[in-house]
Structure formats: C-alpha cells, structure tokens
UniProtKB/Swiss-Prot annotation:
A Pfam family it matches: COG6_N
Upper classification of the organism: Eukaryota, Fungi, Dikarya, Ascomycota, Pezizomycotina
Signal peptide (UniProt feature, chain positions): none
Family: Belongs to the COG6 family.
Subcellular location: Golgi apparatus membrane
InterPro entries: COG6 (IPR010490), COG6_C (IPR048369), COG6_N (IPR048368)
Membrane topology: Peripheral membrane protein
GO BP term, example: protein transport
Known function: Acts as a component of the peripheral membrane COG complex that is involved in intra-Golgi protein trafficking. COG is located at the cis-Golgi, and regulates tethering of retrograde intra-Golgi vesicles and possibly a number of other membrane trafficking events.
Keyword set, alphabetical order: Golgi apparatus, Membrane, Protein transport, Transport
Protein's name according to its UniProt entry: Conserved oligomeric Golgi complex subunit 6
GO cellular component labels: Golgi membrane; Golgi transport complex
Residue ranges, compositional bias (Acidic residues): 689-699
Domain of life: Eukaryota
Length: 731
C-alpha cells in the first residue's frame, strides 16, 4: 500500500520549521521578518479543501491515527508494511487459483481434443459443400436452360443469348479442369457443352436464314436481335459465311428485280409505284439512258452499303472480333496456314455489296453494250466514256479499286471508247472514197468535212475539259495525256485527208494557201485546250513555219516577176557569190545579196554588155517597175487573198517586200558598180590615146563629171530608181 503523503513531505515541513532558528545571528532583522512573512503567506495560501486532501484525511481518521510526533515519523513505514503484507496474501490466493486451473485442464483435455477434431471435420465438410455448390452453379446448366438453347420451338431472345454465353463460359472454363490429374470430369463437361453449343449455333443459323427472307433493308429500324445474332454467329466462320452466301443470293435476286422494275416498270410478283416513270420510257437518248441507269446503280449501291453497315458494322468491331475468335478456334478453315489471319471488316462489307449487285451489274453491262453498239454518234459515245469514267472513280472510292463494279465500269469504258474509235474510222473510210467531199473549195478555205470534224473535236475537247479535276489539269497538259488517243482517231486522220486533198489543186501557190488555211483552222481549234496543244500544237506550228517559208518564196517570186526585176537578177546570177559562200536556204531562194563590196567581180564592167542591160531592155524593165510600184503592195496582198489569216498575209508580204528591196539594192549596186567600172576603163583608154573620149562627158573614177554636178550617166541613167524610193513606195 502506497504512502498517503508525498515522499519528503515531512522532511520539507521540518526543514521549514527549523530554517528560521538556523539563521545567522548576524542577519539583519529585516530579512528575518521578510522570510517569516513569506512562509506564513505560503502556509496560509495553501488550500485543504480539495477532494484528494479530504480523502487522505478521512482515511487517516478511520485508521485511528493520532497526530503525534512518533506517529508522524512511523506513518510511512507502517503503510509500506501493510502494502507488502497485502501483496503477499494476494500471491497466495492466485497460487491456489493456478493449481485449480491446472487440475481442470487435465480433466478437460480429452474432451477438447475430440471437439477440435469434430470442428475440423465440420469445416472441411462445409468447404466441400461450398465447392460442390459453386461447381454445380458454374458448370451445370439446367434442363430448362438447355431447352431454351437447343429447342426449335423456343424463340431467339435475350434469354437464349444469356444461356449461350453461360455455356460458352462453361466450355472455356473446362480447360481448367483438364489441368488436373483426373481429367474425366473436364472431358465429359467439355463434350456436353460442345454438343450444346453446336446445337445452339445451328438453331441460330436457321433462325437468321428465316429472318433474311423477310428482312427489309430499306427499313431503318432493323431488329437489334438479328444484329446480335449475326455477331454471335460470327464466332462460327463456316456458318457465318454460309449465312452471308444465302443473304447475298437473296439480295442479288431482290436488287435485280428492283433494277428490272426501274427500267420497265414491271416487277415480278406484284405491282409497283405507278408515279415513277420507267427509265426506258423517260430516257430519250443514249447518254440520258446510260446516265439514269448508272445513277440508279450508284444510289442503290450507297443505300445497300449503308444498310449493311447498320446491319453488320453498326456495333463497332464486334463481328470482326467474333470472326477472329472463330478463325482461331477453327484452324482448319484457314487457307494460308503459315500466315497470321486477320479480318478486314470494311473489305468484307465491300465484297458483300459486290455480291449483292452481281445480277444488277450483269444487266447493266448488257444494256449499255447494246445501246453503244446501236449508236453512231461519236460525241455521244465519248460523253458516255467520260460518264463511265466518272462512275468508275466513284465506285472505286465506294467499294475499292478491285471491286466488281469498278472493273465493270472499266470494261464498259474500254468498250465504249473502242466503239468511238470504230465510228471515227468508219467516217474516215467513207470520206476517203468520197471524191467530191475531198475536193478543195474554190476559195481555198478548209474543206467542209474538216470543219465538221473540228466541230466534233471541239465538242469532244469541251467534254474532256469539263471532266478534268483541278488536280488533273497540270498532268493533262503533258505529252501523251488521256486525250491523246482521241486526237489520234478524231483529228489526225481528218487532218491528213485535208492535207492530201491539196494534190487536187493545179499550182503550188494554191496548194500552199489551201494547206496553210487547213493548218491555221486546226491550230485555232486546238490551241484553246492545253491537253490538246501539248501533243499536237508543235507539229502544226512546225508545218506552218515550212509553209510560211514556201509562201514567202512564192510572194517574193511574184514581186520579182511582176516588177521585171527578176530578169535583171537572172542576168546577174553569174555575179552572185560563189557556191561555197554559206547562206540560209531562204536567202538563196529570195536572192538576197550581201553587201556590194563583196559582190563586185573583176569583170563587172561587162554587165553593160549583157542582153538584159541593153538600152531597150533596161528601159522596158524600168518602165515595168514604174508601172508596178504604185499598186505593188495591194497586188502582192491580193496574190494571197485566199489566205484566211490577215496577219499571216501581212507578215509574209512584209518579209517578201523586204527581200525584194534587198534584191533591188543588189541590182542597183551592180548597175552603179558597172558604170563606175566603165568610167575607169574609159579614162584608161583616153590616157593611152586609143579612144577619142567618152560619148558625152568625161567621167572620172568617182563616176562624176569634172565640174562637180551630180549628173548620172550610162546604165544608171536608163534605170534611175533608187532603193530608198522603192522602200518608200512599198512601205
């Protein structure tokens, strides 16, 4: 038992009581008075009214303790003694309790062991019961559920799919049972679940086939049950593809019947909407007829794809996942065993749409070929070619480049273009045997058949230009573009016929003018279209350049003949530059002369002895030149009056006039040179005394009389025209 007073409390009180007498006698009286006051204050301020002090005082009171000095000194020891005695008695009592417990344990040990064994057995039994219940609940399917799964009388509803999911899970979990030592249970359960699954898939397959017979794809509210059934059936690829084959055959028949009804308004089985006019009765030309059929096929293809997307792809990749799982579970259905099998949903969808439209494609091809074979209008055929090309690109984007519809559009496009080529060849053959059509017109303009061909070509080029996209414009401007085959059959043969018909004309001038008119007309037609100019403009321009040089020679020769200058040039031919002198062919034809200093031979004085330079002949040429010059430019232009390009005539005439002026300058220079040479000869003869002098005046080496007058003499007097005058009159 603990002490009722804090340890050292008594000593503290006694020290307090004895502290004052211990003060030194030398301490001041004031300090002793303050210490006593502080002590009294401390004692008086202590409170003895709290509960702990009251309880302690009450306990002392009950023990009968007297407040004496001896008692206060022994109180602590007495209390500790009592505590020790109490503790010893408690220990003795607990020892008796321990002995009692040991005896009780010895007596109950067999009972406890038996009870423990029973409890363990109970726990094992409960665990086995739980395992059995869980096994039965998970691996055993009730007869009612199996009836829903396999019976043909039971409907395909949510319960069917729930039971099917459970049986599939049981079949999958049987793999765990096969991992143990005893595999009999797992094998039996797997065999049973496999039979149930096969029966369920067969039931689902027959139900989907039945639903497909009455399925209306035009109805946007397609049953969710059939979509779910297709997703589930996809886990059996063989059944799923058989189902798709059945569906494709049914849709092929339905769409073929619908196409026939759209064409003829005679659907098999029942009447249709009489407000819709059949295509064969509303389309009055081949282009409209083919366009309406293609538009119907395109609209049907889009609708069919959208409906099949809603049926097969609306729920994401569930069908693809199911088929992938089925391919993994049916390895014997793989074609390429060494390759990883993957399912492309979009490709499968496009293939299904292609199969649905097999009958429609066959009917469309037959009708288009019949229409094209019976039509002889090339422009319409070419428009059909572009229409087919447009739908080929459309179906390629919709179903893929290797789809049946895209291939059929390509085949029809090639067939129609071959028909177009055949029509153009027939026209060329007919024209080749029509002599009247090939005869050039009197005005030497382009022939009528060529103008008709260019008119058709313009329509073809406009059709092609309208069909070009912005991304194709640049590529179409290169050589050998898509329009080049058209030009080869619709332009080149007619141009060749027009050029060959020039042989009917009597003279070279008419032939050159006629051929030039043909080429100018052709150039003006194709130059407006870059895709045609890219391949045919350069050859035409080259041919026109050659014809221009020929017309320039003709015009130049006309000026020389009409003016009489040609006679003088012919006489001076021996005074022209030597054959070794290099000059362009055109200058050789035009008779252009190099500068006078390079053309004066040593015997230039003999020019006056030539017949063409005798007085009468030279006066006649000079008079002919004077008569020609006032109307020379108009006459020269009139010489090419049948040429249909005024600018072409002007440029050729101007160059011919320039060549004529150079020829005149050459003749003038030779005449002046001859006079000067004769003057030098006369002077030499005078100095030698062999002659009395000149005819009228003495001519110096400079060709002038001694008195300084500018009087001309000799040939120059007979041929007074100057190059400057000629240029002014012909400007």
């Amino acid at each position: 038992m603990e002490s009722y007073f804090p340890p050292g409390a008594t000593a503290n009180h006694s020290s307090i009581r004895t502290s004052s007498p211990a003060s030194t006698p030398l301490s001041p009286p004031t300090q002793r008075s303050n210490a006593l006051s502080n002590r009294l204050t401390s004692v008086l301020s202590a409170s003895y009214a709290d509960s702990d002090i009251r309880d302690a005082l009450e306990t002392l009171s009950l023990r009968g303790v007297h407040n004496t000095a001896e008692t206060r000194r022994q109180l602590r020891l007495d209390v500790q003694k009592e505590v020790v005695e109490c503790n010893a008695e408690i220990v003795r009592d607990f020892g008796k309790v321990a002995e009692h417990i040991v005896r009780a344990k010895q007596d109950t040990a067999p009972v406890i062991e038996e009870a423990s064994a029973l409890m363990n057995q109970k726990k094992e039994s409960e665990t086995k019961q739980q395992l059995l219940d869980a096994f039965v609940k998970h691996f055993v399917v009730s007869d009612d559920d199996l009836l829903v799964l396999t019976s043909a009388e039971e409907p395909i509803d949510d319960r069917f799919f729930d039971v099917l999911d459970r049986v599939k899970q049981v079949h999958h979990d049987c793999e765990v049972l096969l991992g143990g030592e005893n595999q009999r249970l797992g094998l039996e359960l797997m065999e049973k679940s496999s039979r149930n699954l096969n029966s369920a898939y067969q039931k689902l397959f027959r139900w989907i086939q039945k639903e497909f017979k009455s399925l209306n794809l035009e109805d946007p509210r397609i049953s969710s049950s059939i979509r779910r059934a297709l997703r589930v059936l996809a886990e059996r690829p063989s059944l799923f593809h058989s189902c798709l084959d059945f569906f494709a055959d049914a849709r092929d028949y339905a769409l073929s019947d619908a196409f026939h009804y759209a064409l003829t308004d005679a659907v098999s089985g029942s009447g249709g909407d009489r407000n819709v006019k059949p295509i064969e009765f509303s389309a009055h030309d081949p282009l409209r007829y083919v366009g309406d059929m293609l538009a119907w096929v395109h609209s049907t293809t889009v609708s069919e794809r959208e409906a099949l997307e809603a049926l097969f792809v609306a729920d994401g990749e569930e069908i693809a996942k199911g088929i992938q799982a089925g391919l993994s579970s049916e390895p014997w259905s793989r074609i390429d065993e060494g390759e990883e099998v993957s399912f492309d949903g979009q490709k499968a969808l496009s293939d299904l749409v292609n199969r649905d439209l097999v009958g429609v494609s066959r009917a469309l091809r037959q009708r288009v070929e019949l229409v094209i074979q019976g039509h002889d209008e090339p422009v319409t055929c070419y428009k059909v070619v572009h229409l087919l090309s447009f739908y080929r690109a459309t179906f390629s984007r919709l179903l893929g480049t290797k789809s049946n519809l895209a291939d059929m559009m390509q085949t029809l496009e090639n067939f129609t273009f071959a028909r177009f080529e055949s029509i153009m060849r027939e026209q060329v053959n007919v024209l080749s045997n029509d002599h009247a059509a090939l005869t050039p017109p009197d005005d030497l303009s382009a022939p009528e058949f060529f103008l008709d061909a260019l008119e058709e070509l313009t329509s073809l080029m406009k059709t092609h230009d309208a069909s070009l996209g912005a991304e194709d414009a640049e590529s179409e401007s290169t050589a050998d573009n898509k329009f080049t085959p058209v030009l080869r059959v619709a332009f080149d043969p007619f141009l060749q016929l027009a050029k060959s018909s020039a042989a009917e004309l009597p003279d070279a001038t008419a032939r050159a003018i006629y051929t030039t008119n043909v080429l100018l007309t052709a150039r003006s037609t194709i130059s407006a279209f870059p895709f045609a100019s890219a391949t045919h403009l350069n050859p035409i321009s080259t041919a026109l350049s050659s014809l221009r040089m020929e017309l320039l020679e003709i015009q130049h020769r006309y000026l020389l003949d009409a003016s009489g200058l040609g006679v003088l040039l012919a006489a001076l031919e021996s005074f022209s530059p030597s054959p070794t002198t290099s000059k362009p062919e055109s200058e050789g034809k035009d008779g252009h002369a190099p500068p006078q200093a390079d053309r004066q031979p040593t015997d230039i004085a003999e020019i006056a002895d030539l017949p063409a330079f005798q007085q009468e002949a030279l006066i006649a040429v000079s008079q002919q030149l004077d008569d020609f010059l006032p109307s020379a430019l108009m006459d020269a232009t009139d010489n090419l009056k049948h040429l249909q390009s005024a600018s072409f005539v002007q440029s050729v005439t101007e160059e011919a006039v320039e060549a004529f002026c150079r020829d005149f300058e050459f003749v003038e220079g030779m005449i002046i040179g001859a006079d000067e040479a004769r003057g030098r000869v006369h002077i030499k003869r005078t100095e030698d005394g062999s002659d009395a002098g000149v005819e009228d005046d003495v001519v110096t080496e400079s060709g002038k009389v001694p008195d300084g007058d500018e009087q001309e003499s000799g040939l120059r007097r007979l041929f007074p025209r100057t190059t400057g005058e000629i240029r002014v009159l012909l400007s």
